[in-house]
């Protein structure tokens, strides 16, 4: 297969993994687009994206326009004369004139099995909803949000032990493999594009810190899914004794209870069992303010009086 001249557009670590795969391939990455440097850390020092750092380390020209809607930026991109543009978690909207510029157009690697979970947080929403599988879709980009024709799909079972962090790692490995397969198919003309079924489409909205508050009026099953979805960010939590307590790991208990939602049923080194609207949730790993995450046994040693049976955990901030 003849090497393709590729423009790569991406910003976070997930995107950098895909850029590295292209750099390891026989294709030519002729330019990299990434978001402008942002203030980060306590000193708010301007910090380059992981994609920029990788591009600079490999002596690839880097472009960081604040927008691709203006003609000078579009002309600069067109001057690269790329065969194709690969977009992975870039963060800027690509207008139609940009999508039409490369000979083979623009393709995107998305962390879900489209058309399910279009949008910003597909990995987290798959866990949040209790999906049994997820995967990667490589699509031909159009002007919509993740609405383009699908070129290649891979699937991955979601395990009970998975969190957003672990799924992210799995998809960050699966995505680059799918990307290289799709590029080969595009170059050879062997890929058959598949339209997305709009009837099956839904949107993966960004997570919020407010959404991470545990609502004991939900089912134990749903709360278990949410704790996994919100790990490592924004991390599920509840308010108790005037403190915000983060919850990193739970499981659905086989215990049954008629107690009011939010009531502690039992507390032992095996876990703190809390009644919900449907079922009992066992808290296994938590984080007290200013402390590291700890197993419940250690939490009870430090603050056992907070978690006595029949204590009611608040649904709202106290």
From Swiss-Prot:
Protein biosynthesis is among the record's keywords: yes
Gene3D superfamilies named among the record's database cross-references: Formyl transferase, C-terminal domain (3.10.25.10), Formyl transferase, N-terminal domain (3.40.50.170)
Listed Pfam families: Formyl_trans_C (PF02911), Formyl_trans_N (PF00551)
Catalytic reactions of this protein: L-methionyl-tRNA(fMet) + (6R)-10-formyltetrahydrofolate = N-formyl-L-methionyl-tRNA(fMet) + (6S)-5,6,7,8-tetrahydrofolate + H(+)
GO cellular component: cytosol
Transferase keyword on record: yes
GO molecular function, a single term: methionyl-tRNA formyltransferase activity
Keywords: Protein biosynthesis, Transferase
Sequence positions that bind (6S)-5,6,7,8-tetrahydrofolate: 112-115
InterPro entries found in the cross-reference section: Fmt, Formyl_trans_C, Formyl_trans_C_sf, Formyl_transf_N, Formyl_transf_N_sf, Formyl_transferase-like_C_sf, GART_AS, Met-tRNA-FMT_C
EC number: 2.1.2.9
Family indicated by similarity: Belongs to the Fmt family.
Annotated HAMAP family: Formyl_trans
Function field: Attaches a formyl group to the free amino group of methionyl-tRNA(fMet). The formyl group appears to play a dual role in the initiator identity of N-formylmethionyl-tRNA by promoting its recognition by IF2 and preventing the misappropriation of this tRNA by the elongation apparatus.
Name this protein carries in UniProt: Methionyl-tRNA formyltransferase
Name of the coding gene: fmt
């Amino acid at each position: 297969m003849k090497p393709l001249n590729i423009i790569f557009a991406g910003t976070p670590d997930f995107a950098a993994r895909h850029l590295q795969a292209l750099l390891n391939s026989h294709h030519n990455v002729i330019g990299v687009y990434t978001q402008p440097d942002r203030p980060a850390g306590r000193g708010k020092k301007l910090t380059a994206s992981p994609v920029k750092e990788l591009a600079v380390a490999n002596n690839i020209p880097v472009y960081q326009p604040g927008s691709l809607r203006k003609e000078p930026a579009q002309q600069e991109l067109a001057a690269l004369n790329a065969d194709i543009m690969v977009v992975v978690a870039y963060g800027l909207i690509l207008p139609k004139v940009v999508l039409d510029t490369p000979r083979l157009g623009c393709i995107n690697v998305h962390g879900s099995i489209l058309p399910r979970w279009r949008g910003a947080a597909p990995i987290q929403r798959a866990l949040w909803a209790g999906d049994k599988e997820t995967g990667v879709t490589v699509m031909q980009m159009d002007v919509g949000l993740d609405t383009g024709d699908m070129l290649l799909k891979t699937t991955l079972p979601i395990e009970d032990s998975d969190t957003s962090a672990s799924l992210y790692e799995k998809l960050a490995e699966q995505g680059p493999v799918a990307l290289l397969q799709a590029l080969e198919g595009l170059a050879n003309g062997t890929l058959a594009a598949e339209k997305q079924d709009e009837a099956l489409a839904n949107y993966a909205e960004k997570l919020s810190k407010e959404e991470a508050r545990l609502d004991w009026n939900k089912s134990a099953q749903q709360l278990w899914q949410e704790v996994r979805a919100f790990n490592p960010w924004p991390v599920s939590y509840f308010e108790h004794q005037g403190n915000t307590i983060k919850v990193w790991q739970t499981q659905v208990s086989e215990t049954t209870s008629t107690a009011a939602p939010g009531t502690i049923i039992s507390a032992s080194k095996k876990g703190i069992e809390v009644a919900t609207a449907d079922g009992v949730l066992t808290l296994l790993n938590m984080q007290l303010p200013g402390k590291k995450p700890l197993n419940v046994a250690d939490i009870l040693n430090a603050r056992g009086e907070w978690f006595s049976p029949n204590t009611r955990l608040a649904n709202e901030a106290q």
